[in-house]
A protein has these predicted regions:
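Elongated, amphipathic alpha-helical interaction scaffolds
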Residues: 1-205
Length: 205
């Protein structure tokens, strides 16, 4: 038995990434995930429970919902086993984050076109199972809004990243980037007797 928490349980994942005392871990993970695109300096955790707009509409509870210092919204989900319509659920979660922005504008009395000046929403799904749906067929699936014929960016307001851990097969020695080291640690944390990479990555000290 390893010495460390199981990040694939609800308690373990939220303790690792979803607490004030551990938010440096979340920031480091996201910065490694988006290396070369942007740098996050701080995050503010938001209410994870999003109620339905009416009594007959179901709400949702995110694993982690936070806003960065430059106002990017992040939903980070851990799914330990396959469930039907997982990709559809992640799209629904993103829509709730946009609705939350709309409510903020409504309460401030703003009107169009300000109402539609959304900030970007990123949904990061860590999947500890082999997908059965055709949408996810490799370790990292990166989805953005693009124009089909030119593949040029249509809008930066919505992004999905699906990380399917069974497709990640690198050994400790083969991990080179900070992101690869994160994935290795997450995948094997429950059975590790010691954390690797502490000499190269101080966040694991």
């Amino acid at each position: 038995m390893g010495r460390y928490i199981n990040p694939f349980t609800d308690w373990g994942f939220k303790r690792l990434f979803g607490q004030e005392f551990s938010k440096d871990l979340l920031i480091n993970f996201l910065n490694d995930l988006f290396e070369g695109e942007f740098q996050i300096k701080d995050v503010t955790f938001k209410d994870k429970e999003q109620l339905g707009d009416t009594n007959d509409l179901r709400g949702c509870i995110f694993d982690i919902y936070c806003v960065t210092d430059d106002d990017k919204h992040f939903i980070v989900e851990m799914q330990n086993r396959w469930v039907p319509f997982f990709v559809n659920r992640s799209i629904y979660y993103a829509s709730k984050a946009f609705v939350a922005q709309r409510k903020k504008f409504d309460e401030a009395g703003d009107r169009t076109p300000v109402l539609y000046q959304f900030v970007p929403v990123y949904v990061v799904c860590i999947m500890n199972f082999m997908p059965k749906e055709h949408e996810v067929t490799k370790f990292r699936t990166d989805v953005a809004l693009r124009e089909k014929s030119s593949d040029s960016m249509f809008s930066d307001k919505l992004r999905f990243i699906y990380l399917s851990l069974p497709f990640f097969d690198k050994s400790e020695e083969e991990c080179e980037t900070g992101f690869e080291k994160w994935i290795y640690v997450l995948k094997y944390m429950e059975v590790l007797e010691r954390l690797p990479f502490t000499a190269q990555k101080k966040i694991f000290d």
